[in-house]
């Protein structure tokens, strides 16, 4: 099979399209019933990472998604090292990953000198530090998620598309979960209904997780950060080969971004959720986005349930939450896709080992949550860093200058 190109109807932006899967079901009037050991709800990075693990486990698994692929997903599209490692281990085609020159702009960088910047491999562009090598990497989510689903299909993972979960219940704590919903065609027409009985349901269904909302008795308020996204063609922007993070607002970790992607750029605003940052209205978010990216496709916005130091309520037995559904995102330092992958992979590994070694569903659930909580503690450090910055403890430019001086002085001080 060969890949082809598709063009956005809004801007003409070219993206790579992998072979589309035949995800439409044949029309049927009967209720579709299934019984499995594990049901994965959502086939983004978390659900597909979980599915890849379980496809080789021998367990009876089904993965569903309300969409038909390929489909777009609002995202900044940036890839961290951990995400890249997973993708390369699974042989992602290099042509759908974009490389560019990373650039960070902060008002405090006015204190730096060209000599200090050059000493650490950067060039100083006004108040911005730009990498000298094209090491910033990104991928459009429509390409990433379609490739991940294609990989799951090749691995033999049973999947259904157009299946939208609407209810989830069980008779008692010792009974399996029953998930029900509607099946829609690519044109969004309801064709039939489904009912799946599963011992474990893995919630990989993102920001507005239905699995999370229907199973957690305590609905503690989750901090929501705001973000926007606008795709533009290469001829609509300056420096399309530079991926910029622009911290425009003093004593505020919010930032504007413009990341290079195949065929153009992904630009947007991340507005911080922190208690000491004034809230931003949706109208103001759109206005800031237009100012930052005057030309391009329609602007899309979303809320991000972000990682904080607050503990999340325990899930009931047989419910494993991953990625955005578990509030693991840290937009401050770009961690979204990688944490979705990590938590999905972790869920798959623990489910595979747990069922194969005769663990109970309760034991599997708590083992997953305990393992994820250990990682969560490590990931929460950036929240403390935000507190330090807003409290005036952090001196970014000063610390950067000191580290650069140390890197310059170190060779001479270590000579015999």
Report the location of each language-model feature.
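FAD/FMN-dependent oxidoreductases across multiple families
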Residues: 166-167, 273-350, 356-359
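Conserved Rossmann-like nucleotide-cofactor binding loop
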Residues: 46, 69, 208
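Beta1/beta-strand and adjacent pyrophosphate-binding region of the FAD-binding site
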Residues: 29-46
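C-terminal helical "tail/cap" subdomain of flavin- and related membrane-associated enzymes
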Residues: 349-416
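Predominantly flavin-linked oxidoreductase catalytic cores and closely associated redox partners
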Residues: 151-295, 311
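Conserved N-terminal glycine-rich FAD pyrophosphate-binding loop of Rossmann-like flavoproteins
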Residues: 68-88
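A conserved beta-strand/loop capping segment in the N-terminal third of enzymes
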Residues: 84-146
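Glycine-rich FAD pyrophosphate-binding loop
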Residues: 39, 55-75
């Amino acid at each position: 099979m060969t890949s082809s190109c598709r063009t956005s109807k809004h801007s003409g932006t070219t993206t790579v399209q992998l072979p589309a899967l035949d995800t439409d079901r044949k029309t049927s009037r009967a209720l579709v019933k299934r019984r499995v050991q594990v049901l994965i709800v959502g086939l983004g990075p978390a659900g597909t990472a979980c599915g890849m693990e379980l496809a080789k486990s021998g367990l009876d698994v089904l993965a569903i998604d309300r969409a038909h692929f390929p489909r777009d997903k609002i995202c900044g599209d940036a890839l961290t090292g951990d995400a890249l490692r997973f993708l390369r281990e699974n042989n992602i085609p290099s042509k759908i990953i974009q490389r560019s020159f990373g650039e960070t702009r902060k008002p405090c960088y006015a204190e730096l000198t060209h000599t200090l910047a050059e000493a650490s491999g950067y060039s100083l562009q006004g108040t911005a530090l730009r990498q000298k090598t094209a090491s910033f990497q990104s991928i459009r989510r429509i390409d990433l998620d379609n490739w991940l689903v294609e990989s799951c299909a090749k691995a033999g993972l049973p999947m259904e598309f157009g299946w939208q979960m609407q209810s989830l219940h069980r008779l008692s704590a010792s009974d399996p979960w029953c998930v029900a919903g509607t099946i829609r065609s690519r044109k969004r027409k309801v064709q039939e209904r489904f009912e799946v009985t599963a011992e474990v349901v893995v919630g990989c269904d993102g920001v507005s997780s239905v699995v999370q909302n229907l199973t957690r008795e305590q609905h503690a308020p989750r901090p929501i950060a705001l973000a926007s996204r606008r795709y533009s063609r290469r001829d609509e922007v300056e420096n399309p080969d530079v991926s910029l993070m622009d911290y425009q607002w003093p004593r505020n970790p919010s930032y504007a971004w413009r990341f290079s992607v195949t065929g153009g750029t992904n630009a947007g605003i991340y507005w911080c959720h922190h208690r000491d940052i004034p809230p931003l209205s949706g109208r103001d978010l759109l206005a800031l986005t237009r100012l930052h990216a005057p030309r391009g496709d329609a602007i899309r916005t979303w809320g991000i349930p972000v990682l904080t130091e607050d503990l999340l309520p325990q899930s009931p037995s047989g419910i494993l939450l991953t990625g955005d559904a578990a509030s693991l995102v840290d937009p401050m330092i770009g961690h979204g896709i990688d944490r979705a992958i990590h938590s999905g992979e972790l869920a798959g590994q623990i489910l595979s080992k747990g069922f194969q070694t005769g663990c109970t569903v309760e034991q599997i659930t708590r083992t997953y949550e305990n393992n994820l909580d250990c990682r969560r503690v490590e990931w929460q450090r950036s929240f403390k860093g935000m507190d330090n910055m807003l409290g005036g403890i952090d001196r970014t430019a000063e610390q950067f200058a000191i580290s650069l001086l140390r890197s310059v002085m170190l060779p001479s001080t270590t000579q015999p």
